[in-house]
């Protein structure tokens, strides 16, 4: 039996590929090609960021319902013990290495990375902060 390769997508990729109505970002074509035939997953952090962004932007009922439907159809990695352990290890290693992901304003990014690390799945992200992060396979 062939297993479908999976990819965790960061919030920027998820938003651009699945939620934006006008898509003129030059990275979209490459991301679409990479994701073709792959199982797309998101982190609980991405779900939270999408919902917070939509509520802050005061999306209308229809657009909010569409976003929730898309989120509900997308497998979401929850913060189980593996994810929490991966997060703790990532924090310690980033501090030891002086990697930028250690910064306070990257807490959400660390959770996304920890989800990918814990489940041994690559991460597709448009944010360069992930490059060189320990134990993380990044595509972008």
Give each language-model segment a name.
Residues 10-12, 109, 127:
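Acidic active-site catalytic centers that drive phospho-/nucleotidyl reactions
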Residues 14, 47-50, 84, 130:
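A generic structural signal for short hydrophobic patches within well-formed alpha-helices
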Residues 10-11, 50, 87, 116:
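Generic structural signal for small/hydrophobic residues in well-ordered secondary structure
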Residues 1-43, 52-69:
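Short, well-structured N-terminal submotif of metal-dependent ribonuclease cores
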Residues 2-3, 75-122:
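Active-site neighborhoods of divalent-metal-dependent phosphate/nucleic-acid chemistry enzymes
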């Amino acid at each position: 039996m062939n297993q479908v390769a999976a990819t965790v997508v960061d919030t920027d990729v998820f938003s651009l590929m699945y939620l934006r109505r006008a898509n003129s970002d030059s990275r979209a074509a490459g991301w679409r090609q990479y994701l073709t035939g792959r199982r797309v997953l998101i982190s609980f952090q991405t779900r939270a960021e999408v919902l917070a962004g939509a509520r802050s932007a005061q999306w209308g009922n229809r657009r909010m319902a569409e976003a929730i439907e898309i989120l509900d159809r997308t497998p979401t990695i929850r913060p189980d013990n593996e994810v929490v352990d991966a997060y703790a290890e990532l924090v310690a290693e980033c501090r030891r290495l002086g990697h930028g992901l250690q910064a306070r304003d990257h807490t959400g990014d660390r959770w996304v990375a920890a989800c990918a690390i814990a489940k041994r799945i690559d991460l597709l992200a448009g944010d360069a902060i992930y490059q060189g992060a320990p134990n993380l396979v990044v595509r972008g």
